[in-house]
Amino acid sequence: MTLLPGDNSDYDYSALSCTSDASFHPAFLPQRQAIKGAFYRRAQRLRPQDEPRQGCQPEDRRRRIIINVGGIKYSLPWTTLDEFPLTRLGQLKACTNFDDILNVCDDYDVTCNEFFFDRNPGAFGTILTFLRAGKLRLLREMCALSFQEELLYWGIAEDHLDGCCKRRYLQKIEEFAEMVEREEEDDALDSEGRDSEGPAEGEGRLGRCMRRLRDMVERPHSGLPGKVFACLSVLFVTVTAVNLSVSTLPSLREEEEQGHCSQMCHNVFIVESVCVGWFSLEFLLRLIQAPSKFAFLRSPLTLIDLVAILPYYITLLVDGAAAGRRKPGAGNSYLDKVGLVLRVLRALRILYVMRLARHSLGLQTLGLTARRCTREFGLLLLFLCVAIALFAPLLYVIENEMADSPEFTSIPACYWWAVITMTTVGYGDMVPRSTPGQVVALSSILSGILLMAFPVTSIFHTFSRSYLELKQEQERVMFRRAQFLIKTKSQLSVSQDSDILFGSASSDTRDNN
C-alpha cells in the first residue's frame, strides 16, 4: 500500500509525521520486532513508469487495486484486505457489479481498476497505517471529531485505537459532548423565549416576563438588570463572609456562651438575616424560571445553595426548641448537644463563597479542571502517599535511635512531618536533630518537589485549555444572544409596519362602507 507518483505527489506529509506523538515513545508502548519482508508484500512503492496509464493487465486486477483518496493514489494487494472484510475497503472484494462498487466508493475507473473516494487524504494516512501495520493512532494535530467521522466512514471500530490514543480520543469526544449539551440548553432557552411570544396577549406577556427573569438571573451579560443582579449577589456573598468572620470574635463568643446578646451581636444577626433573605429570594427566582425543576434541583450549585441556606432556618428551629425545653435545674447535656449542632451548622455558612462560581469564569474553570483531571490528582495523591509511607518510618527510627528527639513520638506523628516537608510548607514544629535525619529531610523535600511537578504540568495545560474553551463559549453565547435580539427587533418592526398598513386599509374600507 504505497503512494503513487502523479497528481498531488508533492503533498507535504510533514504535518502527518508520527514523531510528534509522544505515545510512540518506548516508555509508553514497547515496539514489536518488525517482520522482514512483510511491508514489501503488503505495500510496494511503484516507479513512475509502472503507474498504469492506459489500462492494466487482468492478472494485475486480480492481484492489486489502486485507491484514490482526495487525489492521492495508493496501491495495495487484495490480500491486505482479507484481514479487514468488514471495512469499506474490504467490501470492495465482495462487489460483483458496477452498482455494488458505486455503493462503496464515489467513482470507479474500469481501465485502470482505480477506486475514487472523496475523503480527506490527510486523515486516510492513519487508516493506511492501520491497514498496513495493524496500529491505529490519533495524531495530536488531528481533530478528534473529524477522526471519528473517518473511522465511521471507513468502517473501523474505535476499539482498535491504542490505549494512549484512545484515552485522549475519548477525552476530546467527552469535552465536545459537554459543549454541545450546553449549547442545546441555551438553544432550548432561546427557543422557549421565542415560542412564549404567542398570539395570545396574556401568554405573550407571561412569556416575556419569564424570559426577562431568566436573562436577569442566569445571564449577567444580557443587559443592565442582569449585571445589577449579579453585582448584588456578589455583594451579599462578600458581606456574609465578613459577617461570619466578625461573629467569631472572642467577645461575641463569650456573650453567646453566657446567654447574653449585646448590640453588636444583635447587629450581626440582623445582617445575617438580610443576607439569607436575599439568598432565599434568589433561590426562588432561579427555581421559578428553570424550565426543568428536577434538573435545577439536581445541579451542584443548587445543592450548594441549599446547604448554605438551610442551616440558618434550622438554627432558628433548634433555638426555639431549646428555649422551650430549658427548665430551671435541668441538666446541660441537651443544651450542649444543641450548641454543638448550631456550631456545625454555622460553619457551613462558609459555603456561601462557592456561590461566586455562578459569576466567576475562573472558578468555573477551576471546577471543570478538577473534573477533567481526576486521574492526575489521583496520581499526585498516590505519589505523596508512597513517599510519606517511605520517609516517615525512616525518620522515626533515625531520630529515636540517634537523637532521642521528643517531637517524633510515633510513626503517625512523623506522617504529619512528612506531609509538611514534602509540600515545602515547613511549619518548624517538628525538626530533625541528627545528621542522618537531616539528610532524610533533604531527600523528602527534593522528592516532594519532583513528585508534585510531574502531574502539575498536565493539570496546568488542562486548566489553560478549559479556560479558553469557557471563554470562547461565553463569547459565542453573547454573540448568539445579540443576533437573537437583533432578529427579534426586526420582526417586531416588520409586524408593526404591517399592522399600520393593514390597519389603515381596514379603516378606509369601513369609511367606504
Swiss-Prot record:
It comes from the Eukaryota. Residues 1-224, 290-300, 360-374, 468-513 are cytoplasmic. GO terms for molecular function: potassium channel regulator activity; voltage-gated potassium channel activity. It is found in: Cell membrane. Its main location: membrane. Residues 247-267, 322-338, 397-411, 432-438 are extracellular. The chain crosses the membrane at residues 225-246, 268-289, 301-321, 339-359, 375-396, 439-467. GO terms for cellular component: membrane; plasma membrane; voltage-gated potassium channel complex. Coiled coil: none annotated. Residues 191-204 have a biased composition (Basic and acidic residues). Expressed in brain and placenta, and at much lower levels in kidney and pancreas. Keywords: Cell membrane, Ion channel, Ion transport, Membrane, Potassium, Potassium channel, Potassium transport, Transmembrane, Transmembrane helix, Transport, Voltage-gated channel. A motif (Selectivity filter) lies at residues 424-429. It is a multi-pass membrane protein. Residues 184-204 are annotated as: Disordered. GO terms for biological process: action potential; potassium ion transmembrane transport; potassium ion transport; protein homooligomerization; regulation of potassium ion transmembrane transport. Regulatory alpha-subunit of the voltage-gated potassium (Kv) channel which, when coassembled with KCNB1 or KCNB2, can modulate their expression and their gating kinetics by acting on deactivation upon repolarization and inactivation during maintained depolarization. Potassium channel subunit that does not form functional channels by itself. Belongs to the potassium channel family. G (TC 1.A.1.2) subfamily. Kv6.1/KCNG1 sub-subfamily. Heterotetramer with KCNB1. Heterotetramer with KCNB2. The transmembrane segment S4 functions as a voltage-sensor and is characterized by a series of positively charged amino acids at every third position. Channel opening and closing is effected by a conformation change that affects the position and orientation of the voltage-sensor paddle formed by S3 and S4 within the membrane. A transmembrane electric field that is positive inside would push the positively charged S4 segment outwards, thereby opening the pore, while a field that is negative inside would pull the S4 segment inwards and close the pore. This is Voltage-gated potassium channel regulatory subunit KCNG1. The gene is KCNG1.
